[in-house]
């Protein structure tokens, strides 16, 4: 990850990822802080791109997301609490992210965690590289990713629908019970 000082942040540029951007399986692009392209270039080892995996190694352990091909930006800078993983051609990054969200995957990911002070993974990159994962052939990985991503999309759509319904119910409630002028006399 990177060690970015507060004075380096600007209003627009290359987004910096932190723990709040690592929700569930995928990258949350709701809010960002930014650094200039020049600063991002100087932090080349802390740059993550579409197709990369980002893992939190200090703080909220167990966070692991995939940067999708249709992400808002083509490049991100990871904070000092994360590290980046690039997969070889034997594994789909989405499959690996799904795997590390299973109880077995979380156990393997967190087996070297220190709980003294701020939770952290010891030597995160080298420890991660030593984790053994039995991988099915690519065709099976693709099928697993298709099934889980279809379910994930339905979950997101349902959440958006629920949020919309909640906003409508709140507006009706506010209009009828809080806005006294809207209540007919009598």
Task: Kindly give the residue locations of the regions a language model identified.
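Short peripheral tails and domain-boundary helices/loops at the edges of structured domains
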Residues: 72-95
